[in-house]
Amino acid sequence: MNSPAEPRCIVSLTYDDALPCHFESVAPLLEEHGLHGTFYVPCSQGFFDNAESWREVATQGHELGNHSVFHPCHDQAWLDEAYNLRHYTARRWSDEIRLANNILTLVDGRTVRSFGNTCHHNIIGSGATASTVAKLVPEFCVAARGEHTGKPVDLKKINWFNLGTRGADQATFANLRAEIDRMCVRGGWLILTMHGVGPRDHNLHIAENEHTQLVEWLAARQDTIWTAPVRMVAEALKPSRRALAQAAR
C-alpha cells in the first residue's frame, strides 16, 4: 500500500538486534504478503557476518534502521560496563551513531533512516552531563522510535525524535489486533517492537504463529491500515520531508 494522502491508521513492524531469523524468515514472510518492516541492526560482528543477507533485505524494500554499533544501554545485568550509557558523553554517542550510519550506507546505499533507541533508553550520561537521544539524534536520523510507551503515536502531536513504541514480544495476535482496531477508530500510528520471532535467536520473542497471524491480518487490510517502515512514514508525514519527496517526482 502506497502512502495515503492523509493516513489515519498506521502500523510499523520493527525488529531489533539483527537476528538470523529476521533475514531467514521474517523479511521473506513480509514480502510474501506485500509488507515491509524496519530492522534495527547494531553494526557489530553478527551484522558483518551476514552483510550480504542484510543487503538483500534492504534491496527488497525494508528499512535498515540505526541501532548503534555496540548497543549501549543503561544498567542492564547482561551489559558490558564499557557500553553503559551512564558512562557515555554526547560526543561519544554521536560518534557511534555516525559510524553506524556510514556502515549502513555501505550496505544499503541509503542516507536517510530512523533510529531505534537501544533498550528504549533516551538518556545519555548521568547527572549534570546527561543529555537525551531526542536532542542529539536529529543530526543523524529522520526520526527515533524512542521510549517504550505502550501506546500509539498521536498523529496530531508527533514528537519525531521520541515517537514511543509498544513492545510486542510475548504478545498475542488477538491482543494486538484489538489494540489496532481501537486505534483505527480514533486514528494513530502503532510502532511495534519485536526481537525474536520464535524462541531460537532471542529470549525476548513473539511466537511464530502469533506473528504470522498478525502479518496475514495486516496484509488483508492494506486498504484501511497503512503498514510501513518507520522511515517511510516519517518521509510521508513530516512536512519538510513530504515537500522534498514531491519536488523529486
Question: Where in the sequence are the language-model features?
Answer:
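Short, solvent-exposed loop/turn segments at secondary-structure boundaries
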Residues: 42, 126-128, 202-206
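C-terminal domain-boundary segment and adjacent tail
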Residues: 2-5, 37, 46-48, 141-156, ...
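Short, surface-exposed alpha-helical recognition segments that flank or form part
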Residues: 14, 88-92, 202, 206
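His/Cys-centered metal/cofactor-coordination and adjacent catalytic loops
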Residues: 17
